[in-house]
Amino acid sequence: MVKRHVLVALTVGWVTGLCCLSSIAATDNHPNIVIIVADDLGWADVSFHGDQIKTPNLKRLVDEGAELSRFYVCPVCSPTRAGLMTGRYPIRYGLMRAVVPPWRKGGLDPAEVTLPEVLAKAGYHHRGIFGKWHLGHSHVKYHPLRRG
């Protein structure tokens, strides 16, 4: 009996949340921004750059959106992610060689302005980053929830 009440309560909460989100989305005039970063995906690994493996959904995203084809990346994820988040070269903030593991002290300097912070100032109230962080774990000031 208790499981049923919990299930009903969770369902009501979930539906209420969806209704609230849809009403918020209907009043938001900002265009959606979706950035996809894929590890180990080469330029020619997608069908719209000539590969034989079909990637129709990625092609549709490029056709209906924008493809950024001039960029700088590092061979490991932390410097690349930090560059994307700040718009700066990794050597400028000292994250240029390796992944920032959870036990390493330090991370992306909290004084660095990040993309989510810029979006917040531009009126984007609903922002999300999904996937790995790897820009500092040892102290709360480096956590992603503190970064806009």
Regions found by a protein language model. Give the residues of each.
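Formylglycine-dependent sulfatase
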Residues: 3, 9-10, 14-148
